[in-house]
């Protein structure tokens, strides 16, 4: 019996046809501080939130911008997540102050002490997604192990204060994400159309007050949404009446927000309709007993041979005018 051995050739194979995809700084890069990178690594975020966060970093720091207008479709293209899920994760990051929002612009918040990371409370990710996020515990203000946390002070929005129906949720329930919301801050939110109308109104305010401070657009959009859903107004009527108020001599300094527009809607509409009809609210009443108009009249130009002028004057009470005297005079040419 002869011992034979079969030699098998395990070569590296032919990889010449495969395209190598290697990252290179020449293709662009994002400058990120080590402190911020460590903070992101230690933040207890869901996989979806972290993917959206990285996408926002790419669209801002990747272009050397602190903030930029980022649509949900752009986030979906980078994260490979549905547009709706990207919107939900983005708004959650905004509520945690990890992402800043100014109108329709978004960007990373470099002030780590302002971050508010919710507690997971030992729940599974599937359960946690369906429950409310509690913002009681915030990101530590100092590095290292510490029990000191910074609680976020409640900011008072200067809109939606005109009534108790300013929002759809109680003040302490800040977690419910509205699927139709293009902007949301706590329980105040609005659709993309509401936000567009709010930005248009602020542009109108700046025409009469160029130094006006940028408002809380979530509160403005919330007031516009309430006018639309509860008062039955539409965006066109809101903008038309708001523009008239900004151009009116009296109302231009009194109606500078959607909340004020909603509060004064009836008065504004009445005054605008009177103005368009050519009727002013201060029109004097006609005095039927006033005969001052006769003075200075040249009676010789009358086409009649004789002109009889009868003047009735009230002798008794002005309200009753029961007793009266009548004087008749005859004038000739």
Swiss-Prot record:
UniProt keyword annotations, A-Z: DNA replication, DNA-binding
Ranges of Polar residues composition bias in the record: 160-169
Key word Repeat present: no
Keyword check for rRNA processing: no
Similarity section: Belongs to the phage O protein family.
Role noted for this protein: Necessary for the bidirectional replication of DNA. It interacts with the ori (origin of replication) region of the genome during the initiation of replication.
Identification of the protein by name: Replication protein O
Organism: Escherichia phage lambda (Bacteriophage lambda)
Organism taxonomic ancestry: Viruses, Duplodnaviria, Heunggongvirae, Uroviricota, Caudoviricetes
Gene: O
